[in-house]
Every structure is written in structure tokens, then in C-alpha cells.
Amino acid sequence: MSVTKKPDLSDPVLKAKLAKGMGHNTYGEPAWPNDLLYMFPVVILGTFACVIGLSVLDPAAMGEPANPFATPLEILPEWYFYPVFQILRVVPNKLLGVLLMAAVPAGLITVPFIESINKFQNPYRRPIATILFLLGTLVAVWLGIGSTFPIDISLTLGLF
């Protein structure tokens, strides 16, 4: 047996919410059994089919065998460490580089306290957090791309 909450359209508070485009979660169809028995298995099986299909259609190519006696000219880390690698490579003082890396999560922790005066959930109404996110993403991509270039053109990406 499922229980659904029928909307009481004579309620002035609900009418005001619906007029503003809010209040759509106050009623509707139940999660059991509709979502849990019908939608989730379809999503799980669809994701599984996509992964299997991609692995069959485009298998990963094997690289050349490793040679322990030949060291490459420049060793690069995995792609997700590129921005951190670039910070350590560009900053002359290694302690300053480590402090800059520690400043990133410390700065992210302070964002909710800076935005605490703003009560909106909409990211378009939280300009400080949105600007910090966009700026941080841009800097991380810039540093990540720059870490693949030689050290003399890594900050300018060879553009300037």
C-alpha cells in the first residue's frame, strides 16, 4: 500500500508557493515502488550496458613494454596531479609551494562562512561562491595544461 499526499488547493500558503513555481515536492507519487523497483534497475542496467559496450567497441591499447634501464627525459605524474605538479615546479621555494597547495582547501573551507549572510540556495544568487568556483576551475585547467609544457613556457602556455 502506498500513501500519497494529495494537494489541498484551498490552502493559501500552497497556492502562493505554486504561483511562484515552488511547492512541487509537497505532493506526488511515492518512491516505493515506482522509483526503487522500476527506474533504478533501468538506470543501473543502462549504465552497465554503456560500460560494456564502450569496452567492447574501444578496448584500451597496450603500451610499449617497460624498460627499467631507460629513464624518460621528464617524468610527469598522473593527469589529476598536473595542477599540483605545476605549482611545485614553478614556485622557487618548495615550502611556499606546499603552503600554496594547503591554501586551496583552506580557502574552500572559508567560502561558506563568507557566503553565510546570503540565505539563497540558488547558485546564481551566490556570486562570491560562483566566482570562486569559476576562477578556481580556470586556474586548475591553466596549471594542468601548463604542466605538460617545458618549464620556460609553462606559465604562459607559449601564448605570450
Curated annotation (Swiss-Prot):
**What membrane topology term does the record carry?**
Multi-pass membrane protein
Span-the-membrane segments of this chain are 36-56, 95-115, 131-151
Its localization reads: Plastid, Chloroplast thylakoid membrane
First-listed, main subcellular location of the protein, grouped into a coarse class: plastid
- Keyword Transmembrane in record: yes
- Its biological purpose: Component of the cytochrome b6-f complex, which mediates electron transfer between photosystem II (PSII) and photosystem I (PSI), cyclic electron flow around PSI, and state transitions.
Q: What protein does this entry describe? A: Cytochrome b6-f complex subunit 4
Gene name, per UniProt, is petD
